[in-house]
Each structure stands twice: as structure tokens, then as C-alpha cells.
Amino acid sequence: MFKSGFVTIVGRPNVGKSTLLNAIMKEKLSIVSCRPQTTRNNIQTILTEDNYQLVFVDTPGIHKPKHKLGEYMVKSASDAMKDVDLVLFLINPDEKPGRGDLFIIEQLKEVKVPVFLVLNKIDENPQEKVAETLKTYSELMEFEEIIPISALKGKNIDLLKELMFKYIPEGPQYYPEDMIIDQNERFIVAEIVREKALRLLSEEVPHGIAVEILQMKRNEKGTYHIEGNILCEKNSHKPIIIGKGGSKLKKISQYARQDIEAFLQSKVYIRLWVKVKEEWRDNQSLLKELGYKNMK
């Protein structure tokens, strides 16, 4: 008997959805940064084992939108809860249910498929706090399963996989067994660069940055030559991203190259520039060019 199903992971921004997906896949597939809203696009990730295939839709965190990109991210996350076989609602024990959580719960109540409550970061919280959070959420909604985990340390991830297998239906293998992600290489490269920029810039530049891959060519020796722009919204942000004598941009390129080489399994040369695009997050045509395809 072979089983297959589509699974979506929802939760407030910065709750650890991408980290959980990475723990399940044991691969660095989804951009992980300590800052909220770093996952901007639905990424279908495929886990294939001998007797089942799980297709994960990694979504942006649900939050109140402030611009066109924000509207897209919220719609993307909400749409992902439709036409799936299982929903994982990820929370942190050290945070009481806020308006965002209550908003998600109201949507989950309309879902016709099993919903798991997954408590992340249990290794960072006392058992009393975890128990208190469980009780609070259990009173708000009935869940098919409640699983405490540590995505970062991999605790109870195998248990979570077993329970997901239990609830998904019998079905075909939708993707080849060696396929682990349905986004193209250019998209992944852009996400890796953006992650490094977010990490290195810390609080110096807000979320108003994107990465535009201008060229990605592979020569006869298998070496990739990549060129791209880091887009920012203000002229004042440009020197911050570049850094003194180009030091910050050089570090972004260096750290990105290491991960890109691991991803592509090839040697990589990468050149990056910084370009100002004012209010790019409200520019629908540019958002489509950057890969946010469902903009209207």
C-alpha cells in the first residue's frame, strides 16, 4: 500500500515553519532567517520514502498586510490550506495566542481535513509552560493530534512523520523519487542570496530587499557564473548593503556562494550589485518578475 498527501504548515511569522520543513527533509530547502516574513513564496517540497510521499507547501506567515507583497503573502498562506490532506499548525509555547493565532484558528475551523497542533521549541521552555500552552490552544479548537517538537534539534520529528503517514490517504507517487523541490534553480539561488543579506544586515535594513538573478550560466567545465541585483527601496539603504569598501556585499556574496555550491554541487562564481527600486513591494509587474506569480 502506497500513500501520498499534500501537507501545509501554517503559523504566525517567525514561528519556525521553514526550520521544521528543513528538519523533516534534513536539507536546507527553505530560506531560514531569524527575522519574520522571510519565506515569501509557496515552495513545494517533496519527501519520498518506500511507502509514502509527502508534498509540503511551505507558506509565508499569516499577518496583517501593509503592502501588495504583504497581501500576496497572506493570500498565499490562506490558499495553501485549501485542497490539502493535512494541516500542521505550528506554535511556540512561550507566546500566548495573539490576534494572528486567533485569525488562523478561525480559518482552520473551516478546513475539512485533519489539523495537527505542533508545539515547537519545547527544549527552550519548561514543561509547565508547554502544558499551559497546550491547555490554552486545546480550549480554542479540537486538533486531531498534538505533537511537541524541537525543529532545530530534531526532537520528535520522526514521531511527526509517523503521524502524518497515518492520516494521509492512499494515493499515487506524484513526483519522481529523486525530486525534492519544484522550484527552479534560479529561484533557490535568489533565496539563498536573500537569506545571507537578511542575516548580515540584521536590523540595519528592513524587509524591503529582494534578489533579482540577471544571469545564471554553466560552462563546459560545469562551473556556474551568476550575476544578480540586491534590490532595496531607499537610497540610504544602498551604502549600508554595500558596506565600507564593499565589505558587506563581499560577505553576502561569499556566504551565498558557499551554500549555492552545496546546492548545485558545482563550483560557483557570483557577482552582485545593489540597485534602488523605490516601493518595489507595491510594484505588481516587478513582483511577478521576482517570482510572485499569483499577483493580481
Curated annotation (Swiss-Prot):
Family label: Belongs to the TRAFAC class TrmE-Era-EngA-EngB-Septin-like GTPase superfamily. Era GTPase family.
Positions of the UniProt region annotated as G1: 11-18
Residues covered by the Era-type G domain: 3-170
Chain residue ranges for the region called G3: 58-61
Membrane topology: Peripheral membrane protein
Domain of life where this protein originates: Bacteria
Residue numbers spanned by region G5: 149-151
Function: An essential GTPase that binds both GDP and GTP, with rapid nucleotide exchange. Plays a role in 16S rRNA processing and 30S ribosomal subunit biogenesis and possibly also in cell cycle regulation and energy metabolism.
Region: G4, residue numbers: 120-123
Subunit structure: Monomer.
Name of the featured protein: GTPase Era
Region feature (G2): 37-41
Gene Ontology cellular component list: cytosol; plasma membrane
Keywords: Cell membrane, Cytoplasm, GTP-binding, Membrane, Nucleotide-binding, Ribosome biogenesis, RNA-binding, rRNA-binding
Residue stretches making up the KH type-2 domain: 201-278
Residues at which GTP binds: 11-18, 58-62, 120-123
Subcellular location: Cytoplasm; Cell membrane
GO molecular-function terms, A-Z: GTP binding; GTPase activity; ribosomal small subunit binding; small ribosomal subunit rRNA binding
A Gene Ontology biological process term: ribosomal small subunit assembly
Coarse class of the protein's main subcellular location: cytoplasm
